[in-house]
């Protein structure tokens, strides 16, 4: 069964098994997601300049990498939301879900901008 799973799915399963359902562990996972989001946001701020200042092949690669990174992080947040739905609700987990949904909304907005850049630049 593991042969058919992607690396992301395997990592998620491992984290899910290691996490259990404790609130503390849930917060650790959420902090990890927020950290990854902040790193993406820093790269995102320089994204328009990267796209404008490179040649065609570099633009395509930049757009592909950013799109892939946006997708992977949004998938991870989706998985986090699904994980929280399986855990007994408490105020900390509900707060994490609200933050997850907010991050997901921002990622979708970023994805829309990437699509506009890719149409303009390619």
UniProtKB/Swiss-Prot annotation:
Q: Where is this motif: Nuclear export signal?
A: 10-19, 86-95
* Keyword match Signal: no
Q: Which domain of life is it from?
A: Viruses
GO cellular component term, pick one = virion component
Q: Primary place of residence?
A: virion
Extract the InterPro entries matched here: Flu_NS2
Cysteine disulfide links:
none
Q: Is Nuclease among this UniProt entry's keywords?
A: no
Q: Which GO terms describe its biological process?
A: exit of virus from host cell nucleus through nuclear pore
Record's subcellular location = Virion; Host nucleus
> What keywords are assigned to this protein?
Host nucleus, Host-virus interaction, Transport, Virion
Q: Which family does it belong to?
A: Belongs to the influenza viruses NEP family.
Subunit arrangement?
Answer: Interacts with protein M1. May interact with host nucleoporin RAB/HRB and exportin XPO1/CRM1.
According to its UniProt entry, the function of this protein is described as: Mediates the nuclear export of encapsidated genomic RNAs (ribonucleoproteins, RNPs). Acts as an adapter between viral RNPs complexes and the nuclear export machinery of the cell. Possesses no intrinsic RNA-binding activity, but includes a C-terminal M1-binding domain. This domain is believed to allow recognition of RNPs bound to the protein M1.
Q: What is this protein called?
A: Nuclear export protein
Q: Which organism is it from?
A: Influenza B virus (strain B/Yamagata/1/1973)
């Amino acid at each position: 069964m593991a042969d058919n799973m992607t690396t992301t799915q395997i990592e998620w399963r491992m984290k899910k098994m290691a996490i259990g359902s404790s609130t503390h562990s849930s917060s650790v996972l959420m902090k990890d997601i927020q950290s990854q989001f902040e790193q993406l946001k820093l790269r995102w701020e320089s994204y328009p300049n990267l796209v404008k200042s490179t040649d065609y092949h570099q633009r395509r690669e930049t757009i592909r990498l950013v799109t892939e990174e946006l997708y992977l992080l949004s998938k991870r947040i989706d998985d986090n939301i699904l994980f929280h739905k399986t855990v007994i609700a408490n105020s900390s987990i509900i707060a994490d879900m609200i933050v997850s949904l907010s991050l997901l909304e921002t990622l979708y907005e970023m994805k829309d901008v990437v699509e506009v850049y890719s149409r303009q630049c390619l």
